[in-house]
Curated annotation (Swiss-Prot):
GO CC annotation: cytoplasm
Protein name (record): ATP phosphoribosyltransferase regulatory subunit
Presence of the UniProt keyword Cytoplasm in the record: yes
Entries under Pfam families matching the protein: tRNA-synt_His
Species of provenance: Staphylococcus epidermidis (strain ATCC 35984 / DSM 28319 / BCRC 17069 / CCUG 31568 / BM 3577 / RP62A)
Pathway: Amino-acid biosynthesis; L-histidine biosynthesis; L-histidine from 5-phospho-alpha-D-ribose 1-diphosphate: step 1/9
Subunit structure and binding partners: Heteromultimer composed of HisG and HisZ subunits.
Transmembrane segments annotated in the record for this chain: none
Length: 270
């Protein structure tokens, strides 16, 4: 037990030290967020079902369940001159405490964020002594590009998320692009996608660029996910999920966001 605790703390410390050496600003935020009723958005209120909230006197508090969301909210209200930050700490999900390390880049040009990925990959390989086994790649504009607005009902979106082909066929017909893509192996779906999206569509450009970049850097097992729906309205672009070879519970996830703040985040559960 003692060795496990020490090992986890050492990983967090080595992460922060490494990224500090790579010129990231190390930041530390309280696990408990104090929220301002006057600034809560409709989306914030919808999160109450998935977060631990409580009220004390005239203030409302919540336990952090997502670092990107916390930093997005904070830096939207209090703009920072930091261009890229690194963090380590706890998040609370489904009443479980999870250790997470991650980075945010507030200058999310392609060359910058691919370098962020390489930094993270170096940490995984040389500190965790692990490696990326395969990648799931997607884009939060795909659903809008492939599915007509009148079909984007709650029922249909749930069937897409569940990959319920039989139900979708009854609603959309067999020849619908969503059906034709989902019935293929996820390793082949990127090729199929090109039949239904113009080559210059922003989602297609982003997915192709990342897919080619990963291939050029030796990661060739790339699965497409056309079912993903943005967890927050400010997630509007590419998303990445990387599964590791030796630790099934450790997943590197990331994505582009643009709302009151623009950035790209990567987070790894330890």
């Amino acid at each position: 037990m003692n060795n496990t605790i020490i090992s986890m703390k050492e990983k967090e410390l080595r992460f922060l030290k490494f990224f500090h050496q790579q010129k990231y600003n190390v930041v530390d935020f309280n696990l408990i967020e104090e929220l301002d009723w006057q600034r809560l958005t409709h989306e914030d209120l919808q999160q109450m079902d998935e977060r631990s909230f409580w009220q004390q006197n005239k203030s409302i508090y919540a336990l952090r369940n997502d670092f990107t969301d916390q930093l997005f909210r904070y830096y939207s209200n209090y703009p920072t001159h930091f261009k890229k930050v690194a963090y380590a700490g706890d998040i609370i999900r489904d009443n479980r405490v999870i250790k997470q390390v991650g980075i945010e880049n507030y200058e999310p040009q392609f060359d910058n964020i691919t370098q962020n990925f390489l930094d993270f990959q170096y940490f995984i390989q040389n500190v965790l002594h692990d490696d990326i086994q395969f990648i799931i790649l997607g884009h939060y504009q795909l659903i809008d590009a492939l599915l007509e607005k009148n079909h984007q009902t709650r029922e249909v979106m749930e069937m897409i998320e569940e990959r319920n082909l039989s139900g979708l066929i009854q609603t959309l017909t067999f020849n619908h692009p969503i059906i034709q893509i989902l019935k293929e192996n996820t390793l082949n779906q990127l090729k199929i996608l090109s039949h239904y999206l113009p080559e210059r569509h922003p989602a297609m450009v982003a997915i192709q660029s990342w897919s080619q970049w990963f291939t050029d850097h030796g990661i060739t097992e790339i699965h497409l996910d056309v079912t993903a729906q943005a967890p927050r309205s400010y997630y509007k672009g590419i998303f990445i999920k990387c599964h590791l070879k030796n630790t099934a519970h450790s997943v590197l996830t990331g994505g582009y966001y643009h709302g009151s703040l623009e950035g790209f985040g990567l987070g790894l559960t330890l």
